Amino acid sequence: MRSKKDTNWTLVPGSARDIAAVRERCRQLVRRRAMLSAGVAAVPIPGLDVVSDLRLFALLIDDINQEFGLSEQQIDRLQPKFRLIAYEAAIGVGGMLIGKLVTREVVLQLLRKTGFKAAARQAGKLVPLAGQLASASIGFFAFRQIGYQHVEACARVAQELVTAGVHRPAYS
C-alpha cells in the first residue's frame, strides 16, 4: 500500500468516517491477499502454501498497521500518553500484532493457532483436483478471517486514539 519511507508520516485516521474508509481499503487488501494465498494453496506442492502464507501475511499485517497509523515507528512518534493508550487498546482488543515488528516467529505463532486448517489443507493435497480446490478454499477463508480480525483490532485502537484526541504525531 505504502512504501516504507512514507511510514512515519501516515497519521492515525482523524474521525470515524476516516477510520471506516481505511477499514474498507484494508478489507479489500485482505481479500486480494487471501485470493493470492488460495491460488498458491491450489498448487499441489506440500509446504509451498505455508511459506507463501508466512510472507503474504507478514506483509499484510505491516500494510494494515501502516494504513491505520499503527506501525511500530508510527506509534513511537506519538506523544507518550497516546503511545500508552495505543498499546493498552491493542492489548484490550487482542491485537498482538499492532505496533509490533512482524517477524516470521510471530506469524508462525499466529498461524499455529489455526493449525487444524493447515493440516486439513495439506491432507487435501493428497486427493487430486478436489483436494486442491478444498485446500484453496480453506486457505482463502482462513487467511481472510485472520486478516479481517486484524483490521477490526486496528480500527478499534484507532477509534480509541481518536476519542483520546490524537490527530498528529509529536515531533522531537
Task: For the regions a language model picked out, list residue spans one by one.
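Terminal, membrane-proximal amphipathic helices
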Residues: 1-40, 54-172
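Ordered, soluble secondary-structure elements with a strong preference for glycine-centered loop motifs
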Residues: 51
